[in-house]
Amino acid sequence: MNKKKIVLFADGYVGEKLVRFLLRDFRDQILLIITYKKNQISKIAENAQIRTFVFCNNDHLISNLPKKFDLGFLLWWPKMIQKEILEVSKEGFYNLHPSLLPFSKGKHPNFWAIRNQEPYGVSIHKVREEIDTGEIIAQKSIPIGWEDNGGTLYKKSEKECINLFKKTFPKILLNKITKTIKNSGGSFHLEKEMFLESEIDLEKSYKAKDLFNLLRARTFAGKPSCWFSNKKNKYEVRIKIDKVKINI
């Protein structure tokens, strides 16, 4: 049986971990690794003597892709893939998305899952022209507790994305994906929406639950948070919720 030839688009912690996994177990099938910038993934590819380059623009990408390959994978990739690129892959592209699709398509799913109290998890889906809309082939749900915030959900999604991909990838290679889930409805969010949602209006009334959810959704160590302004000053607000044992 001919081994399928693969192109990887990889970024971030998840991309690095999965590139290491693929190079360890499937190195002879990887034709090319594309990175979003010069980073550790680039170094790993170079050390493994795998062709690699940094994404510049779509024209550069198209001209530097192999003329034909079997499968493409987006591993924590931050950019949309154009139709012309999708059509080069014989069996299409698969994307790893940190939400329980069809909920929270687009940006910042860890924020919206808490803010809107939607189901959360990670998904692998076929890539179509529209963002995060292709058929879902694998999912893992992640429960949300009151102690969670945007940062903790992000970390949980990284771990589960890695686990789900390692479990699902061999099935894709062997054409053993026999069932898909329709990816319609749900919700979609643009990059700017989270920032517009993050201002606290001091004159507005909030239900306590809604305010807690908004504050913890935007709480992420080392990142900007919800904020309010007063007398020309701007203040950031974070929240920490701890579960305590009740003695009966």
Residue positions per predicted region:
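One-carbon transfer enzymes
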Residues: 1-248
